[in-house]
């Protein structure tokens, strides 16, 4: 199975009754009733076109992209905690 890179976006709505219509643009991961937003995942290649389509709807207040693909997850100077090192050596 071939997997594609996906990117998340938060779509803020005026009313949650329109959340169901967003399924045709990607995978609806989460719907917040209190804050009225939907977390939507779509292919990375189609992010810009999907974002433009979503912003054209009357029920969409705002669309924000997830910055997770751009955040560095490997740290260069990550040092282990000294207290944890000694805990593992207690039994030896």
Curated annotation (Swiss-Prot):
Keywords: Cytoplasm. It is found in: Cytoplasm. Its main location: cytoplasm. InterPro entries: DUF2129 (IPR016979). It comes from the Bacteria. One of its GO terms (cellular component) is cytoplasm. This is UPF0298 protein BH2594. It comes from Halalkalibacterium halodurans (strain ATCC BAA-125 / DSM 18197 / FERM 7344 / JCM 9153 / C-125). The lineage of its organism: Bacteria, Bacillati, Bacillota, Bacilli, Bacillales.
């Amino acid at each position: 199975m071939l997997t594609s890179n996906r990117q998340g976006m938060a779509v803020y709505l005026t009313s949650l009754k329109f959340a169901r219509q967003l399924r045709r643009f990607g995978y609806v991961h989460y719907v917040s009733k209190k804050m009225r937003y939907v977390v939507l995942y779509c292919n990375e290649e189609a992010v810009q076109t999907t974002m433009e389509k979503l912003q054209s709807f009357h029920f969409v207040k705002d669309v924000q992209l997830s910055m997770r693909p751009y955040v560095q997850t490997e740290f260069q100077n990550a040092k282990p905690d000294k207290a944890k090192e000694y805990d593992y050596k207690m039994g030896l």
